[in-house]
């Protein structure tokens, strides 16, 4: 019986390590896909399409000062099926928010300083560090929308 208990304990530890790694990798994958999506879909506007992001982005607004906000809101709507791997009842993608608290784990946050969009995620706890300075953070840098 003791052997079964030991094997069960080892199995639980291994399983927890596996699920933790899977969640971390899911956040990384979601983050990468969001960045690619923004770049590819805004390129449609640059090349003359009238809409992008499944019709959520009106390319005719490209010259407006708040274009980055239109883009971020369109991304949030078009990718609303992305779920936070750490809490699948919640959407993963938000325009706004931060990645510096443990509550931010698993979210993909878009910020729009200047004429750019910044995409950042906390892939595992602890998240509480200066933004984009921890190995637990994935940050895209700035995606230029012009």
Question: What is the predicted role of each segment?
Answer:
Residues 43-146:
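Periplasmic/extracellular, small/polar-rich flexible segments of pilin-like filament-forming proteins
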Residues 16-19, 38, 87, 108:
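Compositionally biased, intrinsically disordered low-complexity regions enriched in proline and serine
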Residues 20-49:
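Membrane-proximal N-terminal amphipathic helix
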Residues 13, 27-30, 36, 55, ...:
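Intrinsic disorder/low-complexity signature
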Residues 1-19:
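N-terminal single-pass transmembrane signal-anchor helix
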